[in-house]
Amino acid sequence: MVEVSDTALEPIGDVHRTRIGREATEPMRADIRLLGAILGDTVREQNGDEVFELVERARVEAFRVRHSEIDRAEMARMFEGIDIHHAIPIIRAFSHFALLANVAEDIHRERRRSIHVAAGEPPRDSSLTATYMKLYAAQLDSATIAEALKGALVSPVITAHPTETRRRTIFETQHRITQLMRLHAEGHTETDDGRGIEVELRRQVLRLWQTALIRLFRLQISDEIEVGLRYYPAALFEVISQVNAEVRDALRARWPDADLLSEPILRPGSWIGGDRDGNPNVTAEVVRLATGSAAFTALAHYLAELTALAQELSMSARLITVTPELATLADACPAGARPDEPYRRALQVVRGRLSATAAEILDQQPQHTLELGLPPYATAAELRADLDTIDASLHNHGAGLLADDRLARLREAVRVFGFHLSGLDMRQNSDVHEQVVGELLAWAGVHPDYTSLAEAERVELLAAELSTRRPLIRDGAQLSDLARSELGVLAAAAHAVWTFGPAAVPNYIISMCWSVSDMLEAAVLLKEVGLLDASESEPYCPVGISPLFETIEDLHNGAAILQAMLDLPLYRALVTARGGCQEVMLGYSDSNKDGGYLAANWAVYRAELALVETARKTGIRLRLFHGRGGTVGRGGGPSYQAILAQPPGAVSGSLRLTEQGEVIAAKYAEPQMARRNLESLLAATLESTLLAVEGLGDTAAPAYAVLDEVAALAQRAYAELVHETPGFVEYFKASTPVSEFGALNIGSRPTSRKPTASIADLRAIPWVLAWSQSRVMLPGWYGTGSAFEQWLAAGPESEADRLQVLHDLYQRWPFFRSVLSNMAQVMAKSDLELAARYSELVADETLRRRVFDKIADEHHRTIAMYKRITGQDDLLADNPALARSVFNRFPYLEPLNHLQVELLRRYRSGEDDESVQRGILLTMNGLASALRNSG
């Protein structure tokens, strides 16, 4: 990859081809040229001229395709019959370039923000500064804001993903390249230790090139746990602590008498090691590993910070006077240790006690432990109290500047992360609960055939069981492997709660929750392991029970199920014992796979409206947990706009949402990126809670009626293709790499919940990822164009009048605008010409034409309808940053797609050479990295 020409990097769309636009993006294009040249030099040096020329030819041809100088068929012929040993370095080169282009784009976004701030421009939406200005302008009183933010929580929940599996070495090398490019952007030519930046960049790119991108063996859950935890030392320890403190201080300064945010608002969560829905690899041992590794990460951070603090707080008792509380703390230090340095002695005590805690609760000991024979901390609150003592003493003798630095960050970290780091949610499918509870009831002689009971009988029986403290089983019970496994997993969760604190396992989520009995079955299982006791007037339940409504039908029925649960005095008492808050999870992925993009998004919106009304009537606080994937087809998209697009009352100070896939690295790998994205979540949550953002007012009812009609039409169009077209499953499996996901050891869990060929049983991640790899992006748009077209033609009004209705909704309603904007982003990343190449993998020509023609027609129809409704000529007219990214990045995807098709063809024809398999895996990872939100 030699120096890339400017014309090859010119932003898409005439609106961006202005002199100002080119000047604004020139630094980014220069960074891409620099990194591309270094990568090209590395390829030539390491693999020789022949491989370099192949890579360079592929790059040039890709841009010729972009500029319509050659057609796709000519480029495809370039790779026909290519030697696999030449194909692999080409794939690696373009995969690495995608990674390096990500770095350049991220640096450029930071650069542009700095320029805007330096120019004195108003703070941009999604920043906390802009949000504070809006809140101040609204002139909210203290009582209003205090009530609205009671129990406030914003929780990004990290989940595993098959394509976000970069090895630690790759992760750390990319981090180092980002640091170097940041220095380069600031005008430096050398690092702090005198190394030349370009030389060091070459060193890091060489390390990348000589390091395997993917693991040799199937990803284990232990690998996924490590991937999820790496973001804490990289960024989250620092940024979450800072942002929590800043938000609390800013709001309290404006409303000093409101006592706001007594607990940290920003608290992370995790599913990695607790999500066993369809994943038999999540065992009791895995739960212990996940919770223990998280605790290890937290305590290791605290011990390292305490060690650093001891170096900084060197004050002498001859020069300052400490508080009596600090003196008492320091006196617990063994005699002879730094007698005139009270803070160092106090910190030794804290470090010694925390080391004793680590020895008591961890299987492996972190660095910086100190054996002093002191008692361990029973809770993180005890540790925090000692740190508060140090803080108060420092402020007392005028050392506030020192107290407000590292010590302040550590105190905030302990408030947020405790001994548990992040809450591990447990999740299992309701079918498994039914089977296990039925077995336990039969073994205990309560009922021989629980599954034969009607719903009302089940509820009565389960409520009776929950009203007694008696367990169903005792030691020595003869149970099936499934029942033993489920109870073992829950026992491990109970151990985590009792060892690391109740925040270690905050929620038990029920997948495919269809009824009240589904929730009560989970409660019975929690009771069996000691995590629930409803037999007394004050129930005990440290773990919340959260239903997950994830199909279109379940979303429609969710509010009725919640109402029925809250009508049960026993369950209502459990909710009251947990502060009167009930969490409900909404699934975007399975609802999308079930009914298509528009129908799923509208079903979620309608479900939220109904759940909010149920919460209002019953007097509980509702917390919604959004099961969003990285892609629009799984509920993804810009978080700020997505949160503002929620219906009135749906946020109410609390929000949880899943973060997964390449999105995690894009958001949280670097402190600057992490801060920006966490600020965005907080800003939107505060605005949605405290300001009127829906924009519909009295016109909500007719707007909802329009979407009811359009969503029904969209679901019908989607069903005709996905559920009713003969041979569709065969087409999907042949025209995408979905079949290879399982065969090539991608991810730690099966691609389907059950061993069937059904789309319904296929997991949402492989469903979306497969369409993404083949560049169809079908889950993010299919059915929408037909629905709008039919709706325009269906009413008594003229088509022009009905089009104006849709245009007005787009202008005024954040939800509708967000849905269309996210769809446009997906369609801008789709490429039907490349998709046609994948369709050639379908052997049955009649089937191929039948399905692909439907997809192509709907694609054209959807783009046309988007442009008519919005009045825009370009899919990305309102998102110039993404337009630049698509134009700059996507020519480099071209060779990866063509090579993936070529290697899939070989693999399926019986050429199962290890190199062919590895090549397919590399193309998958390269495309996922380049698309940044592929699954």
UniProtKB/Swiss-Prot annotation:
The active site is at residues 161, 593. Its cofactor is Mg(2+). Pfam families: PEPcase. It is an enzyme of class 4 (lyase). Gene3D superfamilies: Phosphoenolpyruvate/pyruvate domain. Its EC number is 4.1.1.31. One of its GO terms (cellular component) is cytosol. GO terms for molecular function: magnesium ion binding; phosphoenolpyruvate carboxylase activity. It catalyses: oxaloacetate + phosphate = phosphoenolpyruvate + hydrogencarbonate. PANTHER family: PHOSPHOENOLPYRUVATE CARBOXYLASE. This is Phosphoenolpyruvate carboxylase. The lineage of its organism: Bacteria, Bacillati, Actinomycetota, Actinomycetes, Mycobacteriales.
